[in-house]
Amino acid sequence: MQGYFDDENKEYVIKDMKPRRPWLNYLWNEKAVCQCDQFGNGFSWEAIGTQRRDIEKGVRNVYVKDNDTGEIYSANRNYNDLPFYIHETHVGINYQRVVSEYNGLTVIFTVF
């Protein structure tokens, strides 16, 4: 199962963080567009008339360092296949939230 609809919160929850192809979501308003994959990564640009100008290209990683052990990891991407207790993405109207928990630390990363 890749995910499910959460009727109470009116969002789709992606549970499979290693799908065959990326899940893409587009967030926008009158001036800007943001593309997000299941990790919160993607492109952002602003519209200027019929032109667009890139604001951000591709990577929005959140890194965490454990000061006791020196371990550094990406809370939203999990490049090292660490045994996260929670690693999921909540996709709602005008936001996308990546939630992860590893070694007792919960990180919530929201793009809106």
Where are these regions (language model features)?
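Anionic coordination/interaction segments
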Residues: 1-112
